[in-house]
Each structure stands twice: as structure tokens, then as C-alpha cells.
Amino acid sequence: MENRWQVMIVWQVDRMRINTWKSLVKYHMHISKKANRWYYRHHYESRHPKISSEVHIPLGDAELVVTTYWGLLTGERDWHLGQGVSIEWRLKRYRTQVEPDLADQLIHIYYFDCFSESAVRKAILGHRVSPRCECQAGHNKVGSLQYLALTALVAPRRPKPPVPSVKKLVEDRWNKPQKTRGHRGSQTMNGH
């Protein structure tokens, strides 16, 4: 019988970013308790040798699984040292891969306080509204003028530590042009 291959999207991520993601997840699971229904699965609990960890995030009947890998083939850049992340949405026996933006939106629907579009209606009706959104990564569009006015009224406060964002985890920060720092006029630092 011939080999059957299954292809899946794995986002190449550097090791330090994966470690930051894991520590943020553990913080919000155990200390802030905002993600206390999440399940962190260690590498020794998996039978697959390339899986570094899994984070199972319940979303109603479904769940989102963020899997980190190690020991993969290196990428085209020197810093792609065989680390990667895949994001999967599961409902019973159905599984599909999702993009980081959608994963953040799904997480934001179920977890972390939000000052959302519904806050405009609640404020007009005189109801108490949540003063801020803890998960800005879950919003991908500009709000209405009323929403922007309400958010301007309430000063945003950044949660410490920040909410774990899947989009931030797989963000490609290496291909952005970086400025070198050094002494003024240094020939070696200016690239001349």
C-alpha cells in the first residue's frame, strides 16, 4: 500500500514567540482565570514526536486547537529553526484549519470582556456597559461613529499581561524593514 499524505498549514514561528504564547496562555488559565476552561496539553501527552504543545479552547459545542510544533524542516531564513504553529477548528468529527485573524475573532466571541457595538445600544438605553475591550485582536474592522465616540470617552487600559493573540503569534515580524542602530556616521552600521 502506498503512502497517503495529508497536507496542513503550519505557520513558521520563532521559538521565543512560541514561548511567550505558552506563558500568556498559562497565565490566563491559572492566574487571571479568564481562560480557565482552556486545556493545555504538554508534549509528553501527545504521541506525535513533532508536537510541542496543544491548547484546546472550547467554543460552545466546537473547539479551537492551537498546536505548536518543533523539529520541522528549517525555513528559508536563518531564524526559522523548525518551529511552527497550526490552528484547527473542530466540531465533533469535522475539522478544518483557520487563519489567525478568524481564530482571534472566535476566541473573542467566547472569552475576555469586550466593549462592543452592543454597548452603543446599552448606553442609549441607560444600561451599564463594559468600559473596555480586553482583546483588541478580535476586532478586524472600524466601528461606527457612535462606537468610536464611546471608546474615545472611556480611556483604554492595557491588560497586563496581554491577552494571548493567535494573530500576534504567527505574525511575520522578520520581513519588515528594520533600522540598524549605532553611532552616527558609522560606516559598518549604515551598510556602506
Curated annotation (Swiss-Prot):
Residues 171-172 are annotated as: Membrane association. GO terms for biological process: viral life cycle. Residues 40-44 are annotated as: Interaction with host APOBEC3G. It comes from the Viruses. Pfam families: Vif. Residues 151-164 are annotated as: Multimerization. One of its GO terms (molecular function) is RNA binding. The modification Phosphothreonine is found at residues 96, 188. Processed in virion by the viral protease. Keywords: AIDS, Host cell membrane, Host cytoplasm, Host membrane, Host-virus interaction, Membrane, Metal-binding, Phosphoprotein, RNA-binding, Ubl conjugation, Ubl conjugation pathway, Virion, Zinc. Belongs to the primate lentivirus group Vif protein family. Vif-defective viruses show catastrophic failure in reverse transcription due to APOBEC-induced mutations that initiate a DNA base repair pathway and compromise the structural integrity of the ssDNA. In the absence of Vif, the virion is morphologically abnormal. HAMAP family: HIV_VIF. This is Virion infectivity factor. The gene is vif.
